[in-house]
Amino acid sequence: MRKKKIILATLLILPLSQALAVDCKNAATQQDMSQCANLNYKKADAELNRTYKDLLAKTTVAQRPLLKSAQLTWIKYRDADCTFQSSATEGGSVHPMIISACLTHKTEERTTQLKSFLNCSEGDLSCPL
């Protein structure tokens, strides 16, 4: 019975979420632009998570806690740096968009860095794998 309620609720909410979807190529309002910037960040974060999991799977048992610690430290740095970089817009309607854009940029950079570890040249001593 509970499964049926969950399925029914999902079916009722799904059309609403699609109706609220924003055309990011033609976003005209600040709210729409902020929503699109947040969607871009979510996509970048999903790619980072996939790459991180791929890298984690290739590390040795001894390297795993090192990578986990590095990633958690990087997340704290990213969040703090984006908070600083967006501080001039604090309280303004553009603020969420500026934060999302910063998070997206830094997340894409980190993804590129982690992917480079997955594709190291043979003999590259700076590569952990």
Predicted ranges, named:
Residues M1-L8:
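Bacterial N-terminal signal peptides that target proteins for export
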Residues L8-T10, W74:
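Composition-driven detection of intrinsically disordered, low-complexity segments
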Residues L11-L20:
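Hydrophobic h-region of N-terminal signal peptides that target proteins for export
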Residues A19-L129:
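N-terminal alpha-helical modules
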